[in-house]
Amino acid sequence: MLASASRERPGYTAGVAAPDLLDPKSAAQNSKPRLSFSSKPTVLASRVESDSAINVMKWKTVSTIFLVVVLYLIIGATVFKALEQPQEISQRTTIVIQKQTFIAQHACVNSTELDELIQQIVAAINAGIIPLGNSSNQVSHWDLGSSFFFAGTVITTIGFGNISPRTEGGKIFCIIYALLGIPLFGFLLAGVGDQLGTIFGKGIAKVEDTFIKWNVSQTKIRIISTIIFILFGCVLFVALPAVIFKHIEGWSALDAIYFVVITLTTIGFGDYVAGGSDIEYLDFYKPVVWFWILVGLAYFAAVLSMIGDWLRVISKKTKEEVGEFRAHAAEWTANVTAEFKETRRRLSVEIYDKFQRATSVKRKLSAELAGNHNQELTPCRRTLSVNHLTSEREVLPPLLKAESIYLNGLTPHCAGEDIAVIENMK
């Protein structure tokens, strides 16, 4: 079907291809340009080609996106370097000065022993141990609540990095546990995201029904409902948890919001971790934090899914509109070309007709002038113009009379002819 359609209507979807109006045959048969506009343009590309174009990204597009990402990384690296490197240099200088001051004030401690102590402290911090105070007020990072929270960070792929397995058995079990737990959590996240999407969808439907009663356009309703959905989710999963973390952990408002966003986007730097401070927590605090992470990730997944659906719809509509625009553009181009050719043909015909009429008039006038000239200027009826100087006039013979015509400066044999003489004196 598509092949036959493309053979019948190549180029564009007009009913009849625009004829070449400068061609004598077509010009004779088509006195006017044949314009045709189809109400529903047909996209000539096959469905298989369009599907493959949608499903498979071209290398040119991939290369362009790759260059954009690299440029984005370079910009980010430049900004982070400008913001963070001066602070790093300042802290390094401060530590060196403090070490020198400590060694100067404590002669019994040499620099080698102090460096060994610092290395042990750094290793303890990397292991998740805060070497402050004595052993009586130290909180274990591997109690049941902390272990539950760590297992949750494994299967959610957040991986804060503040604690990690140190034994060989723990590392082996973590590998197997992650390979099995991550897909399982993916199914759970999808299910929770669908349920949240359904709940929010019902709420959005009620909001849309309310706006429909107020005669608000569908586009504005969709925009308003989307903004409400995003704002409600941000308040429930970002603002409210940030306030709770600020109060419990003793963080600033910026640090609390920073932790929430870094966690729910699964970045998980580990510089701020809920339940990681050296304070007394409730036993159910860390499990509750993990359930908040679960629901928050599901919300973000629902938002991303909704955005993806919108982008697909917009992309589909855009492709259809582009196809229709191309079809109309091709048809318009053909029609304009046909009209231009017809205009040029008409101008050529008019110019040719005027030229022919001018030529005919010229020939007619030339024929008439030639006839009058032959009739008037016969050998017996000539008009002679004789120019004389004053001195020459005196030398010339007197006028000869031939009937009523006088000759001046002519030979005598012309006296018998009817010749008109005009004397121009200089």
UniProtKB/Swiss-Prot annotation:
GO BP field: cardiac ventricle development; cellular response to arachidonate; cellular response to hypoxia; chemical synaptic transmission, postsynaptic; chloride transmembrane transport; cochlea development; detection of mechanical stimulus involved in sensory perception of touch; G protein-coupled receptor signaling pathway
Region feature Essential for chloroform and halothane sensitivity, mapped onto this chain: 337-385
Activity regulation: Activated by various stimuli including intracellular acidic pH, mechanical stretch and polyunsaturated fatty acids such as arachidonic acid. Activated by volatile general anesthetics such as chloroform, diethyl ether, halothane and isoflurane. Activated by arylsulfonamide ML335 and thiophene-carboxamide ML402 compounds. Inhibited by extracellular acidification. Inhibited by antidepressant metabolite fluoxetine (Prozac). Inhibited by barium. Not sensitive to polycationic dye ruthenium red.
Residues bearing attached sugar chains per UniProt: N110, N134
PTMs per UniProt: Phosphorylation at Ser-348 controls the reversible conversion from a leak channel to a voltage-dependent channel.
Intramembrane parts of the chain: 144-170, 253-283
Phosphoserine modified-residue sites: S348
Region spans: Important for GNG4 binding and L-glutamate release in astrocytes: 17-38, 51-61
Listed GO MF terms: identical protein binding; ligand-gated channel activity; mechanosensitive potassium channel activity; metal ion binding; outward rectifier potassium channel activity; potassium ion leak channel activity; protein heterodimerization activity; voltage-gated potassium channel activity
Binding site for K(+) 4: T157, T266
Subunit comment: Homodimer; disulfide-linked. Heterodimer with KCNK1; disulfide-linked. Heterodimer with KCNK4. Heterodimer with KCNK10. Heterodimer with KCNK18. Interacts with AKAP5; the channel is recruited to postsynaptic microdomains by AKAP5 where it can integrate neurotransmitter receptor signals. Part of a complex composed of AKAP5 and ADRB2. Upon AKAP5 binding, the channel is no longer sensitive to intracellular acidification, membrane stretch or arachidonic acid stimuli. Interacts with POPDC1; the interaction enhances KCNK2 surface expression and is inhibited by cAMP.
Homology family: Belongs to the two pore domain potassium channel (TC 1.A.1.8) family.
PANTHER family found in the cross-reference section: POTASSIUM CHANNEL SUBFAMILY K MEMBER 2, POTASSIUM CHANNEL, SUBFAMILY K
The protein's role, per its UniProt record: K(+) channel that conducts voltage-dependent outward rectifying currents upon membrane depolarization. Voltage sensing is coupled to K(+) electrochemical gradient in an 'ion flux gating' mode where outward but not inward ion flow opens the gate. Converts to voltage-independent 'leak' conductance mode upon stimulation by various stimuli including mechanical membrane stretch, acidic pH, heat and lipids. Reversibly converts between a voltage-insensitive K(+) 'leak' channel and a voltage-dependent outward rectifying K(+) channel in a phosphorylation-dependent manner.
Domain topic, free-text comment: Each subunit contributes two pore-forming domains 1 and 2 which assemble to form a single pore with M2 and M4 transmembrane helices lining the central cavity and M1 and M3 facing the lipid bilayer. The transmembrane helices are bridged by the selectivity filters 1 and 2 carrying a signature sequence TxTTxGYGD that coordinate the permeant ions. Up to four ions can simultaneously occupy the selectivity filter and at least two elementary charges must translocate across the filter to convert it into the open conformation.
Name of protein: Potassium channel subfamily K member 2
Gene encoding the protein: Kcnk2
